[in-house]
């Protein structure tokens, strides 16, 4: 019995010490030190490192739960801010064409593609009104970004290439050199409708 215990403990110690010699001086090797992009599986990020904007892409539940009482600099406490927000003006439209949320992403836009730019909103309204006048167009939803105009069209008849060309021609007059894309996809129409009405 004593020999078995001695042999078992010797094997265990040998197996444990084997890993110590596998990568000599690995602590000083900085070629593979794990500096990967954070992917959001943790909640210990310090929002102050990102100028307090609260956008660290941890995920919805983590964003709700982290930093609950850290001096009003979190995403959940939007009524108690310590600085002026980026856009506290009256909403641009009250007819449901555009969203009325002025305080999206606290003070900065996490993905600033130009969609929430007021000039782009006005331009989208002009394009939507003009495209609605095109023959065979019953309804339209328009999204304008800094480099693109996306138009979703609803029609009760088959939408031909000629109809599409007429929509592009009508929109190009307002597009200011932006790429104009026209779609009859119902899913895109619903998505743009939700985007414009949030």
Swiss-Prot record:
<dbReference type="InterPro" id="IPR019076">
    <property type="entry name" value="Spore_lipoprot_YhcN/YlaJ-like"/>
</dbReference>
<feature type="signal peptide">
    <location>
        <begin position="1"/>
        <end position="21"/>
    </location>
</feature>
<dbReference type="GO" id="GO:0043595">
    <property type="term" value="C:endospore cortex"/>
</dbReference>
<feature type="compositionally biased region" description="Low complexity">
    <location>
        <begin position="95"/>
        <end position="115"/>
    </location>
</feature>
<dbReference type="Pfam" id="PF09580">
    <property type="entry name" value="Spore_YhcN_YlaJ"/>
</dbReference>
<keyword id="KW-0749">Sporulation</keyword>
<dbReference type="GO" id="GO:0030435">
    <property type="term" value="P:sporulation resulting in formation of a cellular spore"/>
</dbReference>
<protein>
    <recommendedName>
        <fullName>Sporulation cortex protein CoxA</fullName>
    </recommendedName>
</protein>
<keyword id="KW-0732">Signal</keyword>
<feature type="region of interest" description="Disordered">
    <location>
        <begin position="91"/>
        <end position="115"/>
    </location>
</feature>
């Amino acid at each position: 019995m004593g020999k078995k215990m001695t042999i078992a403990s010797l094997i265990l110690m040998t197996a444990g010490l084997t890993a110590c010699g596998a990568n000599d001086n690995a602590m000083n090797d900085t070629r593979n030190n794990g500096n990967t992009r954070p992917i959001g599986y943790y909640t210990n990020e310090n929002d102050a490192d990102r100028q307090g904007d609260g956008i660290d892409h941890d995920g919805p539940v983590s964003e709700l739960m982290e930093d609950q009482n850290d001096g009003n600099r979190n995403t959940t406490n939007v009524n108690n801010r310590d600085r002026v927000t980026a856009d506290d003006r009256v909403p641009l439209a009250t007819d449901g064409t555009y969203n009325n949320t002025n305080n999206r992403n606290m003070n900065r836009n996490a993905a600033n593609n130009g969609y929430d730019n007021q000039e782009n909103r006005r331009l989208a309204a002009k394009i939507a009104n003009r495209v609605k006048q095109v023959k065979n167009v019953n309804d339209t939803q328009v999204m304008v970004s800094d480099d693109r105009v996306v138009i979703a069209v609803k029609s009760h008849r088959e939408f031909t290439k000629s109809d599409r060309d007429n929509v592009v021609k009508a929109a190009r007059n307002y597009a200011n050199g932006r790429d104009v894309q026209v779609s009859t996809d119902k899913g895109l129409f619903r998505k743009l409708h939700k985007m414009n009405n949030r």
